[in-house]
């Protein structure tokens, strides 16, 4: 079934204008990994909110090139940047934190129908880090409280992604519900929202959005196993999705690959 957009009424336009003005007086926290999706979210938030704090994590990931990228991106964007140290690597269970595990090559055709709600456990790649988004969002929630922020922005998508369960809309809705039950801000009437501007966007559409906002994708690193110089492997799932996105957007890929 094709969805047809309804005409926008003057009342709807007025409500949108009022909402935009409200957002311009509010603050936001953005999860910034240093990758394509998160930097798009950072610039999206900058265009909407009064103040933005970027939060990155040194969690024992396979390489620190993405953190180097995140620092440079935050500096270019002119936003406050916090890097939080947490050692998820000690838990294991992911090729992104356990060097004894092999990062699988990417395959952008593995889910051609995009019905990600039907993905079973066998289809979730070993690059999934157990409970990572829950851990990251929990820290971001704490930062939101201490920075008087009403919004947390995260670059999850249900379209071009690797099949991780904590990227789905129902997960985000559940976390937002929990956030407003479990925080001082939530119970005192200062509603906290989890914003997912990329949720229904393909990688190509995400790139188009970012370029319209002034993003320099040459600063970003998406690779799961970039080398010490920040060169991407070109074959992991994240690299495959990135390559496909730039190709579909008809935009030159500024990524520096190992081969």
UniProtKB/Swiss-Prot annotation:
SS bonds (residue pairs): none
Cofactor requirement: Zn(2+)
Keyword Nucleotide-binding: yes
Alphabetical GO biological process terms: queuosine biosynthetic process
Positions of Zn(2+) binding: 223, 233, 236, 239
UniProt keyword terms in alphabetical order: ATP-binding, Ligase, Metal-binding, Nucleotide-binding, Queuosine biosynthesis, Zinc
The keyword Metal-binding belongs to this UniProt entry's keyword annotation: yes
Enzyme's top EC category: ligase
Cofactor binding note from Swiss-Prot or TrEMBL: Binds 1 zinc ion per subunit.
Catalytic activity annotation: 7-carboxy-7-deazaguanine + NH4(+) + ATP = 7-cyano-7-deazaguanine + ADP + phosphate + H2O + H(+)
TM annotation in the entry: none
Known function: Catalyzes the ATP-dependent conversion of 7-carboxy-7-deazaguanine (CDG) to 7-cyano-7-deazaguanine (preQ(0)).
Similarity comment: family membership: Belongs to the QueC family.
Stated name of the protein: 7-cyano-7-deazaguanine synthase
Organism: Psychrobacter cryohalolentis (strain ATCC BAA-1226 / DSM 17306 / VKM B-2378 / K5)
């Amino acid at each position: 079934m094709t969805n047809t957009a309804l005409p926008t009424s003057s009342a709807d336009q007025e409500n949108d204008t009022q909402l935009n003005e409200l957002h311009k007086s509010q603050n936001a926290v953005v999860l910034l990994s240093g990758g394509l999706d998160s930097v798009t979210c950072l610039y999206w938030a900058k265009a909407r909110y009064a103040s933005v704090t970027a939060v990155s994590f040194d969690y024992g990931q396979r390489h620190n090139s993405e953190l180097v990228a995140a620092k440079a991106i935050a500096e270019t964007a002119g936003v406050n940047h916090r890097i939080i140290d947490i050692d998820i690597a000690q838990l294991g269970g992911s090729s992104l934190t356990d060097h004894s595990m092999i990062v699988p090559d990417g395959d952008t055709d593995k889910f051609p129908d995009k019905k990600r709600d039907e993905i079973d456990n066998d289809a979730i790649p070993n690059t999934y880090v157990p409970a990572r988004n829950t851990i990251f969002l929990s820290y971001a929630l704490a930062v939101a409280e201490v920075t008087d922020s009403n919004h947390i922005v995260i670059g999850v998508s249900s379209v071009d992604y690797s099949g991780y369960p904590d990227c789905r809309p129902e997960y985000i809705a559940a976390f937002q519900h929990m956030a407003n039950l479990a925080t001082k801000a939530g119970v005192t009437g200062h509603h906290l929202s989890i914003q997912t501007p990329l949720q229904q966007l393909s990688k190509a559409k995400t790139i188009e959005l970012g370029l319209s906002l002034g993003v320099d994708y040459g600063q970003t690193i998406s690779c799961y196993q970039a080398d010490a110089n920040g060169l991407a492997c070109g074959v992991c799932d994240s690299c495959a999705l990135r390559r496909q996105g730039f190709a579909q957007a008809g935009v030159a890929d500024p990524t520096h690959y190992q081969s």
